[in-house]
Design a protein with these regions (language model features):
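Amphipathic alpha-helical segments used for helix-helix packing
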Residues: 97, 108-128, 145, 178, ...
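Short, well-structured alpha-helical segments
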Residues: 99, 103, 145, 162-170, ...
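Key DNA-contact positions within bacterial/archaeal DNA-binding proteins
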Residues: 56
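An amphipathic alpha-helix adjacent to DNA-recognition modules
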Residues: 20-28, 40-41, 49-52, 60-85, ...
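Amphipathic alpha-helical packing segments from all-alpha helical-bundle domains
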Residues: 78-81, 128-154, 163-167
Length: 221
């Protein structure tokens, strides 16, 4: 059987095969770019290079820098909200709950330090992304106000305005993202313990119940 001319042989499709884009991977790449060069270092082109995909592939999922910031925002806020909500639900003792929340916030400030200030400051951030961050921060603040109120009621914190107190604690913990330097070798645990000591102004925490006691208490509700 005669062979078809070479110029009639099946041709390989042009371009790379379409790849599914993992939004978590995109968020990781954007966070890495922030850490390397700040807000100006973030772009669709550089994110594609970080992910090892073609620009055309990434453009099908995210076409603008604003989209990239939105993905990082959603991942960061959802993770923080889920972890805070889980802590509040799993710890009955108010003192332990506040201590755990402060530790969580210290960890977030350290891990998100390259871009946390960008969202809170709003400088250079697209209006829609900043508006979503502002809306989320109000809801997140309510979680903190509830924890602070419980601690005031039980005497772990001095009585006062729980909203102002919650904002002051959050402000203190967010500021960690501005001054933290890995080379100083200050651990998250040290930051959390020092912050907790400051919040309670040196007063010892009230006796805490054991985990088994907390579980029994839940069963009696």
């Amino acid at each position: 059987m005669p062979q078809p001319p070479k110029d009639e042989a099946p041709k390989r499709p042009r371009g790379r095969p379409r790849l599914a884009i993992d939004r978590n991977a995109v968020a990781d790449a954007v966070a890495a770019l922030f850490a390397e060069g700040g807000y100006e270092a973030v772009s669709v082109v550089d994110t594609a290079d970080k992910l090892g995909v073609s620009r055309a592939t990434l453009y099908r999922t995210v076409s603008t820098k604003e989209d990239l910031l939105g993905i990082l925002f959603e991942r960061s806020t959802n993770d923080l909200t889920q972890r805070a909500t889980a802590l509040i639900a799993s710890i009955d003792d108010p003192a332990e709950r506040l201590t755990a929340m402060i530790r969580l916030q210290a960890e977030a400030a350290v891990n998100m330090r390259s871009y946390l200030g960008v969202f809170f400051g709003g400088v250079g951030v697209p209006a829609d992304v900043y508006a979503r961050w502002h809306s989320w921060s109000r809801q997140y603040e309510k979680l903190w106000v509830g924890v602070v109120s419980d601690n005031m009621e039980t005497g772990y914190l001095d009585n006062g305005n729980p909203v102002v107190t919650a904002r002051l604690i959050l402000g203190m913990m967010i500021w960690v993202s501005r001054w933290y330097r890995p080379r100083e070798k200050i651990s998250i645990e040290e930051i959390a313990e020092t912050a907790t000591h400051l919040v309670r102004m040196g007063h010892p925490a009230p006796p805490t119940r054991s985990t088994s006691t907390r579980k029994r208490a839940r069963g009696q509700r």
